[in-house]
Design a protein with these regions (language model features):
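His/Met- and acidic-residue-enriched segments that coordinate or traffic transition-metal cofactors
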Residues: 2-189
């Protein structure tokens, strides 16, 4: 076999294998984007909601006058930070880009609440937490039941008990705030 025949053979083999290589490369790029639009939307919405809970939890620790509200805020910051970390890993594994900043809607909620303080903050924050957790439970239950991706469904299912616990705690804390009608500071810190 002459050099020119050998070169032609190599060129032909390379040319024939190029489409296969490109197809495999394209398939590997799209494998992470095979996430359904509803699963992707759930991840993004859950991430925004989680960031909101963390920000409002920090605000509650600073602005609330009732120690139970401060404690609730601390719990929200801790639990939602943990859930956010888990969600970030799933998003990264699935090729979903998450914003590191709150969107306008959630930023507006933070801005509105942080203008309040004391008993007024306590009442509004707890009202919002009850409402927010009811909505979160519906969304997470829907994802757990109807989600397409096993990892996203698992995250939703595993997070649901914590959200339900948060709702119960939010309702009891809101009742305490309503019934006290004023702040109840303890003398121990």
């Amino acid at each position: 076999m002459s050099n020119s025949t050998l070169i032609k053979s190599v060129v032909i083999v390379l040319a024939m294998s190029l489409p296969v290589g490109l197809a495999l490369a394209a398939d590997s790029k799209t494998s992470s984007s095979k996430l359904s639009s509803s699963d992707s939307a759930f991840i993004k919405e859950a991430a925004q909601g989680g960031m909101l809970e963390v920000e409002l939890g920090k605000a509650a620790q600073d602005k609330a006058s009732n120690d139970k509200v401060k404690d609730f805020g601390k719990r929200m910051e801790q639990d939602h930070s943990k859930a956010n970390d888990e969600l970030k890993k799933i998003a990264s594994d699935k090729g979903v880009q998450l914003s590191s900043d709150l969107d306008k809607k959630h930023k507006s909620t933070v801005d509105k609440l942080t203008k309040l303080s004391g008993a007024e903050f306590d009442r509004q924050y707890m009202r919002d937490m009850v409402s927010d957790h009811k909505e979160d439970i519906k969304k997470f239950q829907n994802e757990a039941d109807k989600g397409k991706d096993a990892d996203v469904k698992k995250f939703a299912s595993q997070t649901l008990p914590t959200l339900k616990e948060h709702l119960q705690l939010a309702e009891s804390t809101a009742d305490t705030v309503k019934s006290s009608g004023k702040s109840t500071k303890s003398t121990t810190k």
